[in-house]
Structure formats: structure tokens, C-alpha cells
Amino acid sequence: MGASSSSSVSEKSIHQFTVKDSSGKEVDLSVYQGKVLLVVNVASKCGFTESNYTQLTELYRKYKDQGFVVLAFPCNQFLSQEPGTSEEAHQFACTRFKAEYPVFQKVRVNGQNAAPVYKFLKSKKPSFLGSRIKWNFTKFLVGKDGQVIDRYGTTVSPLSIQKDIEKALAQEL
């Protein structure tokens, strides 16, 4: 784990972070207070792209009116499987998979230059192999209060976590 574990993250909630959208505009994540979030590092040229994007879109459409939002963060750290610009990644998700949820600016999810929001997520829910994200489409379920509920690896399909999403949506703030 090393020095960059939870001790280097002072934020207590995902709502304390500001990120950039695919065009570079700042987005304060406090706008998602009271919503259940599924934060995912996405890639357009991965073997898991088709199934994950399709199911993320399905989940978003099914639960968005109940306060569920997918936050997609393109990442090129795994075999350069998101080689284009942030805008190209956004266009890909929206055109090919009809994504209506936010697709943010490309980020690093591991290492010294990892996005602060990802340092937070990993510090709150390390996997059994440590906090490092192993591959594209790692998913973090975040409750209405901005706390990380669970972390799901690449091979966990988005549709398989519907019960967890429903449980989080049913919780009071």
C-alpha cells in the first residue's frame, strides 16, 4: 500500500471534489449530493468495453429517475486502451452506446499522478490485493452521503450489482 494510502486523503466525501468534464470545464461533485453514484474508469478499446458500456447505459436509464448517476472517467493507463482525447472518449460513449450520463476528462487512476477523486475512492475501498486499480471498468458504488459503499472489479458486470444499487437508493440520507 505504501505512503499513498488513506492517510494522504483528507476529504471525507466524494462531494468535496471538483473534476473536469470532457471539455475541460470544472464540475463540483457536490451537485450529486443525495444521489447514488457508480464511478467507473472506462476505455473504448478494451475487451470489456461493449458489455460494460451497454449495461451502464441500461442501469442509468432504469434508475436515473430514482436518483442514480453513472460517472464515467476515461483512462488510458491500461495498455493504452483509451488513446484519444477526452472529447473523443465522450463522443464514443454517447454515439456508440447512447450514454446520457456524464463522461469526464481523462484521468490517471493509479500512481503518484492519480486523480484526487480516485485516490479517495481507493483509500475508502481497497481490494484484497491493495488499493491499486487493476484494469478498466473498475466500479465504485457511492451512497447518497458521498461515502463509498463498495468496489467491483472489471469482471463484475454492471447488471449484477442492481440489488446493491436498489439498496443504496432505498437508504435515507
From Swiss-Prot:
- The species is Arabidopsis thaliana
Q: What is this protein called?
A: Probable glutathione peroxidase 5
Q: Which cysteines are joined by disulfide bonds?
A: none
Location(s), subcellular: Cell membrane
Q: Which gene encodes it?
A: GPX5
What Enzyme Commission number(s) appear in the record?
1.11.1.9
Catalysed reactions, as listed in the record: 2 glutathione + H2O2 = glutathione disulfide + 2 H2O
Which Gene3D superfamilies did the record assign? Glutaredoxin
Give the family, as the similarity comment puts it.
Belongs to the glutathione peroxidase family.
Q: What does this protein do?
A: May constitute a glutathione peroxidase-like protective system against oxidative stresses.
Q: In which tissues is it expressed?
A: Ubiquitous.
Q: Which UniProt keywords apply?
A: Cell membrane, Lipoprotein, Membrane, Myristate, Oxidoreductase, Peroxidase, Stress response
EC category name: oxidoreductase
